[in-house]
Design a protein with these regions (language model features):
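N-terminal intrinsically disordered, low-complexity, charge/repeat-rich segments that act as generic
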Residues: 1-40
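A generic structural motif
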Residues: 62, 71-74, 94, 106
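OB-fold (S1/OB) nucleic-acid-binding surfaces
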Residues: 81-98
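Conserved hydrophobic positions within beta-strands
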Residues: 65-67, 102
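Well-ordered alpha/beta subsegment
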Residues: 96-130
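Cys/His-rich short segments
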Residues: 26-64
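Short, conserved beta-turn/loop elements at beta-strand boundaries and strand-helix junctions
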Residues: 69-76, 119
Length: 130
């Protein structure tokens, strides 16, 4: 049995003033987290202010990561209709987890490196590779 559903298209406007370094980093092929100058808590996605009330500093995620979990999406939303089934991966890089995409057949525990690239629609994405 198949039930027809309605098409939903969303377009988000993201305020980026306080996180402009993150978006600029993606364009440069770099991914950043933020770390509190006082309590040393790390944040990804990055945030400008820590919950302890202090400012954070920008730190590039450079080390290797490890796949924590993944899923292959077969039910593709309209905004990704150009895509074939795709793999979403969450990888741990030290004290933060990062969600991204991979074209490789990654498994839990695999070592990965992080990079950025624009997709077919011109949106910057995070990619994982061995």
């Amino acid at each position: 049995m198949i039930v027809e559903s309605r098409e939903i298209k969303l377009k988000h406007r993201i305020p980026v003033k306080k996180t402009a370094n993150y978006w600029k980093g993606l364009e440069e092929g770099r991914v950043f987290k933020t770390v509190c100058r006082n309590c040393e808590k790390s944040y990804y996605p990055p945030r400008a202010d820590c919950i302890c009330g202090n400012q954070t500093e920008w730190v590039e995620i450079k080390e290797k990561g490890f796949v924590e979990c993944f899923t292959v999406v077969h039910s593709i939303p309209a905004c990704f209709e150009w895509s074939k089934p795709y793999r979403i991966v969450i990888a741990r890089f030290g004290d933060v987890c990062v969600m991204g995409w991979s074209e490789e057949d990654l498994r839990v525990g695999d070592e990965v490196f992080i990079s950025t690239a624009k997709d077919e629609s011109g949106i910057w994405k995070i990619w994982f590779r061995r």
